[in-house]
């Protein structure tokens, strides 16, 4: 059996990051983690474009337009949707997740779902690097690996 693995090298990659304006204290940490991961793995800051979305619900459309532009090898979507007392959370979190997945599947451009969906602000802060790991960095690493793996798939 042939085992095909990708490397975590971003030297020649061009990424877009989309982040939400809501919960910016949390999201800013995710963006910092994403940028740091990209640069630490050989990417150049000038090959990383950052787009600010009004909210998580708008992210899929922005991701779709960026993917269709042909300018990016991958897109990293970052945000924080924190559960409240209404059903609004379910619609926003579900809509963002489905839209981001559909963008990736329909365009063939890898798009990471780095939107935190948590019950509390504390949980979101922990996932943004306060206690353990930074989901922005993790989403970026997943995209670096995915792009490099896709490049190894033979074209027919």
Curated annotation (Swiss-Prot):
5-amino-6-(D-ribitylamino)uracil binds at residues 22, 56-58, 80-82, 113. SUPFAM superfamilies: Lumazine synthase (SSF52121). InterPro entries: LS, LS/RS, LS/RS_sf. CDD domains: Lumazine_synthase-I. (2S)-2-hydroxy-3-oxobutyl phosphate binds at residues 85-86, 127. It catalyses: (2S)-2-hydroxy-3-oxobutyl phosphate + 5-amino-6-(D-ribitylamino)uracil = 6,7-dimethyl-8-(1-D-ribityl)lumazine + phosphate + 2 H2O + H(+). It comes from the Bacteria. One of its GO terms (molecular function) is 6,7-dimethyl-8-ribityllumazine synthase activity. Belongs to the DMRL synthase family. Catalyzes the formation of 6,7-dimethyl-8-ribityllumazine by condensation of 5-amino-6-(D-ribitylamino)uracil with 3,4-dihydroxy-2-butanone 4-phosphate. This is the penultimate step in the biosynthesis of riboflavin. This is 6,7-dimethyl-8-ribityllumazine synthase.
